[in-house]
Amino acid sequence: MQLNSTEISELIKKRIAQFDVVSEARNTGTIVSVSDGIIRIHGLSEVMQGEMIALPDNRYAMALNLERDSVGAVVMGPYIDLAEGMEVQCTGRILEVPVGRGLLGRVVNTLGQPIDGKGEIKNDGFSPVEVIAPGVIERKSVDQPVQTGYKAVDSMVPIGRGQRELIIGDRQTGKTALAIDTIINQKDSGIKCIYVAIGQKASTIANVVRKLEENGALANTIIVVASASESAALQYLAPYAGCAMGEYFRDRGEDALIIYDDLSKQAVAYRQISLLLRRPPGREAFPGDVFYLHSRLLERAARVNEEYVENFTKGEVKGKTGSLTALPIIETQAGDVSAFVPTNVISITDGQIFLESNLFNAGVRPAVNPGISVSRVGGAAQTKVVKKLAGGIRTALAQYRELAAFAQFASDLDDATRKQLSHGEKVTEMLKQKQYAPLSVAEQAVLLFAVEFGYLDDVELNKIADFETTLLDYANRTNAEFMRELTQSGDYNDEIKNTLEGILNNFKANNTW
């Protein structure tokens, strides 16, 4: 068969005319090295800081180091099978996580994917993990309380909605227990809770989930998990992901509470990433921006005003303020609060609850040290009744600590000193509280009233706990309506004072404990 050159050229021209190519601009690069979860990529000339880079098998890395001839990125997840020469590409997107009410009651990972085996999550949308905090004009002062249910905290170190209150102490001093009890106490308050577990054992997290479920608080809580077995990248990003989920409620005129357990482990994960990326180390080998790591996170916890909420919701929600309260946890080594990360977070937050191992081992639980625990803004948010009745507690404890130190060397003490020591011991005993047993405002008011007006003076020290249990049972049984109203209003006036006086007089006259 002989081919005609004219026919061939016509056929080629026809094919060329019919050929339609769709041009697609793709910013691609090649992996040049993989080590310890860090990949170096050649190419990607248009990549952004913090951009998600698409890897093979539907995985992602986050661009952190933008250098002259390469990009340093941290892999989100397993990296064992990544190899030199693999092609990657830019996505043009910053990391986002799902947000919405569908996350309540669920356990998710850093990327918002469910890990509790309860099926898909119906989210209301996505939110970037890194968001600029509300400005000065958009904020409102803190004047509403967050009740922890702990007498020692609500009376001496009150927390307000929109506040950042640090929980700091050595390992095994009850930091997580305080945070979990605070979540349990919110189940009827309308405050949505987010618990971010960073670098913890999976068994510990499972225990927390079980306790919240047993106490009926899981339905009101989102649990974000970056366990010890997760990559450093996911541990570093977990607090930001949890914060984005909490901001969903804050920006819609609702109240949310977020607990970061704990930011020491997040700082260690960030240090690991920074050293692997060959960033210059500073004090304690942390990178230079470790302060910014925590400040940009904790500044997002705020109380925002009505205009902010109205503008954000485009007029759907009017006349409501929103808040995100943060309780970051920091673990100290041998009580050293002057280390790098603890001092940073103390300077960022609005106060700290310092839990002391000596007090914890002595049986004072919660082991709050009233001397160096402080709340810088919570006083304005404290309920009126607790504020009025708890005024003398901190002073009594301070005087007791001072006198107790001298009393060790003095053999004979005068009556006034003995009385003060006895009062201090009884106040310390009264502030002790069991785990998973938060008290209402009214119950705290009854006990504080008993301390303030000397109803404990004739009660033996070893009988204080029994006295407390029997008194609360009596008050709730005989004055249920009054206790309910006092918890709701938190008010204090002559009428309430007389009622409290009547409860205690009747109780002491008719009850044994």
Swiss-Prot record:
Its EC number is 7.1.2.2. It comes from the Bacteria. GO terms for cellular component: plasma membrane; proton-transporting ATP synthase complex. ATP binds at G169, D170, R171, Q172, T173, G174, K175, T176. Pfam families: ATP-synt_ab, ATP-synt_ab_C, ATP-synt_ab_N. It catalyses: ATP + H2O + 4 H(+)(in) = ADP + phosphate + 5 H(+)(out). It is an enzyme of class 7 (translocase). One of its GO terms (molecular function) is ATP binding. It is found in: Cell inner membrane. Keywords: ATP synthesis, ATP-binding, Cell inner membrane, Cell membrane, CF(1), Hydrogen ion transport, Ion transport, Membrane, Nucleotide-binding, Translocase, Transport. F-type ATPases have 2 components, CF(1) - the catalytic core - and CF(0) - the membrane proton channel. CF(1) has five subunits: alpha(3), beta(3), gamma(1), delta(1), epsilon(1). CF(0) has three main subunits: a(1), b(2) and c(9-12). The alpha and beta chains form an alternating ring which encloses part of the gamma chain. CF(1) is attached to CF(0) by a central stalk formed by the gamma and epsilon chains, while a peripheral stalk is formed by the delta and b chains. NCBIfam families: atpA (TIGR00962), PRK13343.1 (NF009884). Produces ATP from ADP in the presence of a proton gradient across the membrane. The alpha chain is a regulatory subunit. Belongs to the ATPase alpha/beta chains family. This is ATP synthase subunit alpha.
